[in-house]
């Protein structure tokens, strides 16, 4: 019985793990297959371009939906950072709902960032979008930091996100 489990683990790693592209890594060899999907929130319709190799490529995932729907942006908040923004769903919806909010979106995935920029135009918003591995290229502080963290990267990454977020929050800032 245990021999079969080891074999199954080997099969999963060798045949799936080796060839599967993860949204939290850049994979320039992954063939593009752009698609679109719609999101309705706050009595508005949003359209998002998506592709292989990005998180939740064909729909808004439940966690992001719950985060956006329940997020209470503080009234004093002027600048917001979306860490691990992917194709921009969270940041774009928040910018549309809070047009005076200065939104910055960061991610490690180049393909997701390219789609994020296109999605800004598609949804007629303007956010700042750039590449950063968590806070490695972030030199500002923010009133609010949001993230639907990439749990598949492991606990260490998530702990670093929380630890480093504190350094990038303004006084009375919220994560």
Locations of regions flagged by a protein language model:
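Positively charged N-terminal leader segments that act as targeting/secretion signals
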Residues: 1-10
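N-terminal auxiliary segments of SAM/dcSAM-dependent transferases
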Residues: 11, 15-42, 53
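Residue-level detection of beta-strand-connecting loop/turn positions
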Residues: 43-45, 52, 124
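Conserved SAM-binding loop and adjacent beta-strand
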Residues: 51-68
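Conserved SAM/SAH cofactor-binding pocket of Class I
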Residues: 63-138, 144-147, 153
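Glycine/threonine-rich flexible loop motifs
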Residues: 155-157
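A short glycine-rich, Lys/Arg-flanked "PGG" loop and its adjoining helix->strand segment in the class I
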Residues: 160-171
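Conserved beta-strand signature within the Rossmann-like core of class I S-adenosyl-L-methionine
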Residues: 173-175
């Amino acid at each position: 019985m245990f021999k079969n489990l080891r074999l199954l683990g080997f099969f999963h790693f060798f045949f799936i793990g080796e060839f599967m592209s993860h949204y939290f890594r850049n994979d320039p060899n992954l063939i593009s297959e752009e698609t679109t999907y719609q999101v309705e929130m706050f009595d508005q319709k949003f359209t998002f371009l998506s592709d292989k190799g990005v998180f939740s490529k064909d729909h808004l995932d439940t966690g992001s939906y719950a985060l956006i729907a329940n997020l209470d942006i503080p009234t004093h908040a002027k600048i917001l950072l979306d860490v691990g923004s992917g194709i921009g769903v969270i940041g774009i919806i928040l910018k549309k709902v809070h047009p005076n909010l200065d939104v910055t979106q960061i991610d490690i995935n180049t393909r997701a960032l390219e789609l994020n920029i296109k999605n800004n135009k598609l949804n007629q918003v303007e956010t700042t979008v750039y590449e950063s591995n968590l806070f490695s290229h972030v030199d500002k502080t923010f009133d609010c930091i949001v993230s639907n963290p990439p749990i598949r990267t492991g606990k260490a990454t998530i702990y670093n996100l929380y630890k480093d977020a504190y350094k990038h929050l303004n006084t009375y800032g919220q994560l």
